[in-house]
Structure formats: structure tokens, C-alpha cells
Amino acid sequence: TRTIPQGLSAMLAFDADLSLEENRLNMTKAFDRVSTGQITFAARDSEYDGHSIREGEVLALDNGKLSFIEHDIVKACVKLTRSLVHRDSSFITILYGADATEEQANQVKGQLDARYNGEIEVSVINGGQPVYYFIISVE
């Protein structure tokens, strides 16, 4: 796996009663269904992939690639999550980090709940991770 949400999804698919090959197939299928988003900040001024980035700006990463720059972490998280959702999505998990508040995470959840109106289950977890305000998993 390449991301934390993919690793978590693969771990949840593990079944000790299955063979190595069956587990490999199930775990691979599980992590292949996961799209990952990350909301972080620019540590310094830079240029990246055609984007002019200023220190402190909020960066939205779509499966590891810079998607857009924002100034508000809640807006960035909602916008990025919406871009990760596809027709078959069923679950959204938002892990909020050490530099995001539970209130901000619940604002994200509220906006996504309103947008998807129960069609997609939205969960918020205090991940406590450094560097990333939010890590987003869409399955």
C-alpha cells in the first residue's frame, strides 16, 4: 500500500482463517478501492507542478499529488473529499490531526452529510497525526 487509509483497509480485510493467497487477493482488492486525500500546509515558499506556493498555505493532495491550494482547512477538506467521491463510494473516513480541532472535523462531517444525505456514511476519527490536518479515505 502507499497510503495510511489503504493500509488500514487492507488490514481490515485480513482473515487469519484464509490462506496467504486468499488474503493477498482480498487485501489487494480492499486497498485498490480506497482513494486518499491529505490536507497539509506549505512549510516554505516554493514552486511545484506549476503551482506557486506560499509558506502557510493549505495544500490539498489527491492520492499524493497536489490538487489545489486553499486558505481554509475545512473548505479544503470538503472540496477535496467531494473530488474523491465516485459513483460507487460508500464510506468516507476523516482522520483529523493534532493541528485540527474536533469542531473543524465535525464541520467537515456536517457539510458532507448534508451533501450526500445518507447515501455515503461519513465517519470522523481523531487520528492525532502530525503534519496533516486531515487524512481522507473514500471507499
Task: Label every model-predicted segment.
Residues 1-139:
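N-terminal loops that bind phosphate or other acidic moieties
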